[in-house]
């Protein structure tokens, strides 16, 4: 029985036609001596009517069917009786008068109800992923993902980009997250790594003269997982030669503008807002601020610098700051102030100073230390109005802004502050090129070692590297970092200088990155690019709570696949072939003894 149509495609124009359909039994109803079957495939649902007067054999078969059985049918399209139409589905004006049914495959009783409105245990969903993927939401997510990636490809091809695949088996360069490593059978004792990104290859492609490259790249990182992380993930990887930062911004902004309009009929405004890393931290306490909330950080260091409080004096002596958040039209209760205070302490802060402006008077947890001049300055500078409140904390700059950045979102939840609807894109620029890692006690790259310093800061590489700003940028959407990019270093001497600051010896640099350094000696053009997380973008656009809801076959937070059982042990022969001997941790060894 050869299929002629998809279930969801049939409409009133097909009345009178004979059709052949295949799909899953979505629902069965017996009514008035007839059997009604909702038949489902990827395109939608159509109603079948099985009448014994037309085909007793088909009726007998239909009487044995169960939900999720796979069947094929032949029949005639007819208009539904008046008053029996279903406007909720595209096929609601018609039904199929069944003449023949063929059972392709029965189904066992389902381990969970695919169509329940109740939340389904994710462990069960992942174990029976082939069933979970039949659900409307999952089908919609995966199909939207396909359409989004197709739209990206079309847009970039029209703008002169060439899609080029880069290798999955590469040399290990353990900077940043851990690599997944793969033993070589042909080269005993040597290993490949799976790429954390195609970074080095896309730079090589610019040296090769391809000018504009892109790839829907699979990337791999062996790191501890969270709700927004997967060990294998997909990114839109791009690189362009002879560009400035604004050229890259322009391409990405128009990519989103075109794609969102075509796929979702959403209009977005370009160019996206731009703020520096320092502005983002000072205003929002985060380098990926959620602009849907208006809560901003205010600096009151200057106002409070003469307060006779020991902790303020000692904070300012150490070049600390005093910053806080205004709560417009909110006067917290004692309990609510206590919740905020406890959260600050939980985040390793030293407590809060709070202020409320009610009945024309500024009340505060430190009222006895405030003179009228200080109160008036606070009211005027913060533009406090009747019914407003303010709280602040003192400490080292980075500590204070990070605490307030976390509190900003928790306060929005505590006081039910509504977030604005829509997509709020933002470029964050001018990150530091380096940061000091307290645990490792060394300077590390803020993004990666191939990011170019700003031209005016190049002299600081020799004198004060922690003050060097980078030609890099992050794209943020609704508080989620979609990806990072930068103008790259394309001169060997600057790249070597950066490696030296990062304590990568010339020997290590040659071993790990020698091919790139050598390529720079053969006419490397200025170039830059970006990588955007496809999984994260799709999760936001489909309003999904987890990346696992937009990936067909995701891993759990422990990095396992509940469907296939990966990772698994392998037999000893396979290990011998790649010259590997497994040394178990002590606990595992004891279990096996």
From Swiss-Prot:
Stretches the record annotates as Aspartate: 199-202
Site entry: Important for tRNA non-discrimination: 31, 83
SUPFAM superfamilies found in the cross-reference section: Class II aaRS and biotin synthetases, GAD domain-like, Nucleic acid-binding proteins
KW rRNA-binding (keyword) present: no
CDD domains with a match to the protein in the record: AspRS_core, EcAspRS_like_N
Primary localization: cytoplasm
Molecular function terms from GO: aspartate-tRNA ligase activity; aspartate-tRNA(Asn) ligase activity; ATP binding; nucleic acid binding
A single GO cellular-component term on record: cytoplasm
Residues holding ATP: 221-223, 230, 481, 533-536
Enzyme Commission number, as recorded: 6.1.1.23
Keyword set includes Nucleotide-binding: yes
Superkingdom, taxonomy of origin: Bacteria
Catalytic activity reported: tRNA(Asx) + L-aspartate + ATP = L-aspartyl-tRNA(Asx) + AMP + diphosphate
Binding, L-aspartate: 175, 221, 447, 488
Subcellular location field: Cytoplasm
Keyword annotations from UniProtKB, A to Z: Aminoacyl-tRNA synthetase, ATP-binding, Cytoplasm, Ligase, Nucleotide-binding, Protein biosynthesis
GO biological process: aspartyl-tRNA aminoacylation
Protein role: Aspartyl-tRNA synthetase with relaxed tRNA specificity since it is able to aspartylate not only its cognate tRNA(Asp) but also tRNA(Asn). Reaction proceeds in two steps: L-aspartate is first activated by ATP to form Asp-AMP and then transferred to the acceptor end of tRNA(Asp/Asn).
Oligomeric and partner information: Homodimer.
Family: Belongs to the class-II aminoacyl-tRNA synthetase family. Type 1 subfamily.
Protein name: Aspartate--tRNA(Asp/Asn) ligase
